Every structure is written in structure tokens, then in C-alpha cells.
């Protein structure tokens, strides 16, 4: 008999849910949850489907995730069609297998098994699911969180099913994430002929010393939980494409991944002071993607570590590396937030895959976390 986790994962992978299109994934999950006594509240915004579901009352443990996936790329490069889940040599292939339909299947089956074993569980088990995580992430978890906070909804613990593992399932648990803020900088000059530089003002030349200082600045030294803040230039643009025109504008986009040693306000102040010091004529727009968050050792981290040690027989590393996740929004509710999911080696790649056995193991870990916190 096929494993129920693998069966559900395959059902979800068959749905081509390119962000923010859910393609029917949430309906599958909702039917399974309603069948075991969950109350389900759709919370849709714009083009995005979300739902908040709960069973029981009291101290609340939520499982969070997303049904949307990234584009497949050239499908001819895949060994099998990306939305036709295939098992080869013990690996489940398909877009979303690792990020993160495998986790969603593991969560739902864990909930089914938990409710069967503990029909009168003492706490509240909840699900927070969105179809807008991989792309804009503006109508998904952030808006659900805002709506829940507005009505003072309780959330004590949240397990996000992002693919946190590196080499084997459970070897890495994310108990925090760095913040992310992007600067869109326009430096203004005067366009002119390259043969008459005295009649122009080259913004690229003016900007180079400032950019050099940005690149060489040590923004902080990090701390025991976070690496040092990093700044990376992502995009540059100047000029008309002609070799005889001095550009009149220079656009620079750069991003900070910052630790809890800094705030977004501190970064803004330091960057703007630097630009003023170099006497640049500029306009600057900031886009804050998320604040850093950290969940210290406590009930949730301990439960997750215990579950991994029990089923994987390894002690996971607690790390805050990598990109942002929806955990940054959920942390605003005051909840302890931890990420535990499959191996991330193939996420967003051609031939995305996950060990089928890992999903079964992951579901058991999720169930044990439920048992430790709300049984």
C-alpha cells in the first residue's frame, strides 16, 4: 500500500500551482482537515488564496506553508514532466516536491494521525497556508497575519515547513532568519558628449568612491546566532548604449541581509550619511522585505530537536542562514517560530526531488512535535 504522505504529495504536485495560482491544492488540504474536525476560514486577498484552519482551543501550535511553486524552466531539461510526480530510485521528482508540497503532505498526514491518537487534545492545532510565497508575497501570509493580529488571535508556536535540511532530513533547523532591505539608488548627473567632459557631470565617476565605501564597510560583526550583516550590489545601470555619451543618470540597487545587531533604521541612516559625505545628488528608495527574527531555546525549539533526535538519530544544527521566509511575518505575532523541512539541494532547480522516505520521516517528526506541545 502506498504511503499516505507520498500519495498526498503526489496529488499536490500534479497541480501546476505557479505563484500565486493555487490550482486546487488548498481544496485538497481543506477537505482532509475538515474531515478530522478542523474549522477552516478562507482568507483570500487579491489573486491569492489563503486559509486559516484550527481544531481545539488554548495554547496554539500552527503549521505554516505555501502551495505555490516557482516556474519549471525549460521542461525538456527535466527527466520527467515537472507536474507528473514520478518516483525513481527512491526519489520523488516534481516541481514542489521539496519546496514545499512534500512538507504540506507531511503536515496534513501528521495532523490526521495525531487527531486519531488524541481526539481530545488539550491545545489548539492550526494551519496557515498561502499561495503567495514564491513571488510577490504581498497578499499571502503577511495579510493573514495582519488580519489575525487585528482580532487578537492567539499563536504560541509555529512550525514552517520550508526545506531547511542540507544533507539529510533534520540536520538543520532554522530558528531565525536575517532581515532583508533593498536600496534603489538613483545618482543624478548631467548628460553630455564624452569629448566635452567639462560640459557634463558623470554620475558613475562621482559614485565610485561612495560605492567602494559601501562595499568595504564592516556593518556589524554579527553575534552568536547571526553571521555579520552583508551588503551586496545586485544591479547597475547607466548610459544610453552609445560610446560617445556621458550618462546623466546612474542606477544602483543593493541589498542588505542584516542581523539583530542592526535595525532597518540604522542601515538607512548610515547609508544616507555616507552618500551625503560624498556630496552626491541622489534619490533613494528603500524596500524592507522583512525584519530579522530569532527563536531562542524554549518549548518549540526543544520539541523540534527532540523529534529530530528521536526519528533521525541526529542532533540538528540551529541556524539562521539563507534567505527570507514567511516566518518573518509570523514572528510579528509574538510566536516562537522554527523551520523544519526536507533537504533543499534541488529547490528551484530542474529535476527538483526529495527522498520519499524523508517525507515519511518528516511527517513522524511533525506528529511528535504536536504530541509534545498540545497533546
Swiss-Prot record:
The cofactors it requires, by name, are:
Zn(2+); Co(2+)
One Pfam family matching this protein: M20_dimer
Pathway connected to this protein: Amino-acid biosynthesis; L-lysine biosynthesis via DAP pathway; LL-2,6-diaminopimelate from (S)-tetrahydrodipicolinate (succinylase route): step 3/3
Keywords of the record: Amino-acid biosynthesis, Cobalt, Diaminopimelate biosynthesis, Hydrolase, Lysine biosynthesis, Metal-binding, Zinc
Q: Which residues form the active site?
A: 68, 133
Which GO terms of type biological process are on file?
Answer: diaminopimelate biosynthetic process; L-arginine biosynthetic process; lysine biosynthetic process via diaminopimelate
Q: Show the GO MF annotations.
A: acetylornithine deacetylase activity; cobalt ion binding; succinyl-diaminopimelate desuccinylase activity; zinc ion binding
**Note accompanying the cofactor annotation:** Binds 2 Zn(2+) or Co(2+) ions per subunit.
So what EC number does this one have?
Answer: 3.5.1.18
Q: How does it assemble?
A: Homodimer.
* Binding-site residues for Zn(2+) 2, renumbered to this chain: 99, 134, 348
Q: Would you say which domain of life the source belongs to?
A: Bacteria
Matches recorded under SUPFAM superfamilies? Bacterial exopeptidase dimerisation domain (SSF55031), Zn-dependent exopeptidases (SSF53187)
- What family is this? Belongs to the peptidase M20A family. DapE subfamily.
Identify the enzyme class. Answer: hydrolase
Q: What is this protein called?
A: Succinyl-diaminopimelate desuccinylase
Q: Give a short account of what the protein does.
A: Catalyzes the hydrolysis of N-succinyl-L,L-diaminopimelic acid (SDAP), forming succinate and LL-2,6-diaminopimelate (DAP), an intermediate involved in the bacterial biosynthesis of lysine and meso-diaminopimelic acid, an essential component of bacterial cell walls.
Catalysed conversion reaction: N-succinyl-(2S,6S)-2,6-diaminopimelate + H2O = (2S,6S)-2,6-diaminopimelate + succinate
* PANTHER family, per the entry: ACETYLORNITHINE DEACETYLASE, N-ACETYL-L-CITRULLINE DEACETYLASE
> Which source organism does the UniProt entry give?
Yersinia enterocolitica serotype O:8 / biotype 1B (strain NCTC 13174 / 8081)
Which of this chain's residues are annotated to bind Zn(2+) 1? 66, 99, 162
Amino acid at each position: 500500500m502506498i504511503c499516505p504522505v507520498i500519495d498526498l504529495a503526489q496529488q499536490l504536485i500534479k497541480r501546476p500551482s505557479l505563484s500565486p495560482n493555487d490550482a486546487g491544492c488548498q481544496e485538497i488540504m481543506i477537505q482532509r482537515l475538515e474531515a478530522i474536525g478542523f474549522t477552516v476560514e478562507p482568507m483570500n486577498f487579491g489573486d491569492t488564496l489563503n486559509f486559516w484552519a484550527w481544531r481545539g482551543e488554548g495554547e496554539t501550535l500552527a503549521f505554516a506553508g505555501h502551495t505555490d511553486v516557482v516556474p519549471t524552466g525549460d521542461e525538456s531539461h527535466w527527466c520527467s514532466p515537472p507536474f507528473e510526480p514520478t518516483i525513481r530510485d527512491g526519489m520523488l521528482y516534481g516541481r514542489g516536491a521539496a519546496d514545499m508540497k512534500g512538507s504540506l503532505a507531511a503536515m496534513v498526514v501528521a495532523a490526521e494521525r495525531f487527531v486519531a491518537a488524541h481526539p481530545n487534545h488539550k491545545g489548539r492545532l492550526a494551519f496557515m497556508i498561502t499561495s503567495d510565497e514564491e513571488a510577490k508575497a504581498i497578499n499571502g501570509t503577511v495579510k493573514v497575519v495582519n488580519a489575525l493580529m487585528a482580532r487578537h488571535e492567539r499563536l504560541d508556536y509555529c512550525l514552517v515547513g520550508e526545506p531547511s535540511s542540507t544533507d539529510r532530513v533534520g540536520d538543520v533547523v532554522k530558528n531565525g532568519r536575517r532581515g532583508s532591505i533593498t536600496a534603489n539608488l538613483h545618482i543624478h548627473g548631467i548628460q553630455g558628449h564624452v569629448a566635452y567632459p567639462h560640459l557634463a557631470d558623470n554620475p558613475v565617476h562621482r559614485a565610485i568612491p561612495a560605492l567602494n565605501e559601501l562595499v568595504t564597510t564592516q556593518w556589524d560583526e554579527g553575534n552568536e546566532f547571526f553571521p555579520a550583516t552583508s551588503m551586496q550590489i545586485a544591479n547597475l545601470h547607466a548610459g544610453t548604449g552609445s560610446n560617445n555619451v556621458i550618462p546623466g543618470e546612474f542606477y544602483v540597487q543593493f541589498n542588505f541581509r542584516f542581523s539583530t545587531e542592526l535595525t532597518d533604521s540604522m542601515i538607512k541612516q548610515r547609508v544616507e550619511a555616507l552618500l551625503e559625505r560624498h556630496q552626491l545628488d541622489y534619490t533613494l528608495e528603500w524596500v524592507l522585505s522583512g525584519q530579522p527574527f530569532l527563536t531562542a531555546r524554549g518549548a518549540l525549539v526543544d520539541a523540534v530537536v527532540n523529534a529530530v533526535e528521536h526519528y533521525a538519530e541526529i542532533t540538528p544544527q540551529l541556524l539562521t542562514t539563507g534567505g527570507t521566509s514567511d516566518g518573518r511575518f509570523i514572528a510579528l505575532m509574538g510566536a516562537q517560530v522554527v523551520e523544519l523541512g526536507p533537504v533543499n539541494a534541488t529547490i528551484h532547480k530542474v529535476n527538483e526531488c526529495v527522498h520519499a522516505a524523508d517525507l515519511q520521516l518528516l511527517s513522524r517528526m511533525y506528529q511528535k512535535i504536536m504530541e509534545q506541545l498540545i497533546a
